[in-house]
Amino acid sequence: MDPAPSLAAELWRPHHHRHHFEASSVVTDQGSGSRGGGGSGRRRPRSDAGPEDDDLSKVVSTSAASGGGGGGGQDSDAPEAKRLKPMKSSDKNDSLRTEAGTDSGNSSKAADKNATPPEPPKQDYIHVRARRGQATDSHSLAERARREKISERMKILQDLVPGCNKVIGKASVLDEIINYIQSLQHQVEFLSMKLEAVNSHMINGIVAFPSKDFGAQPYNTAAGLTFDPQTTREFAQGSTSEWLHMQIGNAYERVT
């Protein structure tokens, strides 16, 4: 207990009660002194007391001196001892916590080091080690074969179309091929129209002439309209009109 409240209580007590309290305190002091003296003769002071015990004894002595050696000294020693015990226990708990934290940190680091890295996902295709610019899987190999076939077909078309070898680029080559095919289509249509006109004129001329003028030479339209293998060369060199006049002239010469 704190000595200050006990002193205040003594000041407010009546005079006769105060004398009685002083007498009782003297008796208790004498008894405690006699006990202490007897005990001092029997017990030896501990030489192996630590610094904490020395501090505790100092606190107890100072509290006893401030209390005036009264009966409240024994009561004031108990709270101080109780205060020091929780302080010691809290220090021990803190040290245990720090040790546990360091142990857990070391164990977590060791677990991270011992943990094996995750395996990479397996690929559906077999990876082939190839040079730079070469395909490494089946899909790219098939695409490469398809592109090679397309390039071969383009080369064949370039050889067929005159002047297409000078063009660079697949798009421009295809444009040249399309234009050439369209021009051939127009030429074929024009030639078919001319042939129809020639056939109509020839049929009208045959009907106008009498049959006795021809004699024994029958007119064969198939022979008159036969095409020589040199006609394609002549068409490439000259115009279509010249070729038609040439064919018509040959047909009339054979008829006559």
Swiss-Prot record:
<keyword id="KW-0539">Nucleus</keyword>
<keyword id="KW-0804">Transcription</keyword>
<dbReference type="GO" id="GO:0003677">
    <property type="term" value="F:DNA binding"/>
</dbReference>
<dbReference type="GO" id="GO:0005634">
    <property type="term" value="C:nucleus"/>
</dbReference>
<keyword id="KW-0238">DNA-binding</keyword>
<comment type="subunit">
    <text>Interacts with RSS3. Forms a ternary complex with RSS3 and TIFY11A/JAZ9 in the nucleus.</text>
</comment>
<dbReference type="InterPro" id="IPR011598">
    <property type="entry name" value="bHLH_dom"/>
</dbReference>
<dbReference type="InterPro" id="IPR024097">
    <property type="entry name" value="bHLH_ZIP_TF"/>
</dbReference>
<feature type="compositionally biased region" description="Basic and acidic residues">
    <location>
        <begin position="79"/>
        <end position="97"/>
    </location>
</feature>
<dbReference type="GO" id="GO:0003700">
    <property type="term" value="F:DNA-binding transcription factor activity"/>
</dbReference>
<protein>
    <recommendedName>
        <fullName>Transcription factor BHLH094</fullName>
    </recommendedName>
</protein>
<dbReference type="GO" id="GO:0006355">
    <property type="term" value="P:regulation of DNA-templated transcription"/>
</dbReference>
<dbReference type="InterPro" id="IPR036638">
    <property type="entry name" value="HLH_DNA-bd_sf"/>
</dbReference>
<dbReference type="Pfam" id="PF00010">
    <property type="entry name" value="HLH"/>
</dbReference>
<comment type="similarity">
    <text>Belongs to the bHLH protein family.</text>
</comment>
<feature type="region of interest" description="Helix-loop-helix motif">
    <location>
        <begin position="148"/>
        <end position="184"/>
    </location>
</feature>
<feature type="region of interest" description="Disordered">
    <location>
        <begin position="1"/>
        <end position="125"/>
    </location>
</feature>
<feature type="region of interest" description="Basic motif; degenerate">
    <location>
        <begin position="134"/>
        <end position="147"/>
    </location>
</feature>
<dbReference type="GO" id="GO:0046983">
    <property type="term" value="F:protein dimerization activity"/>
</dbReference>
<feature type="domain" description="bHLH">
    <location>
        <begin position="134"/>
        <end position="184"/>
    </location>
</feature>
<keyword id="KW-0805">Transcription regulation</keyword>
<comment type="function">
    <text>Transcription factor that forms a ternary complex with RSS3 and TIFY11A/JAZ9 to negatively regulate jasmonate-responsive genes.</text>
</comment>
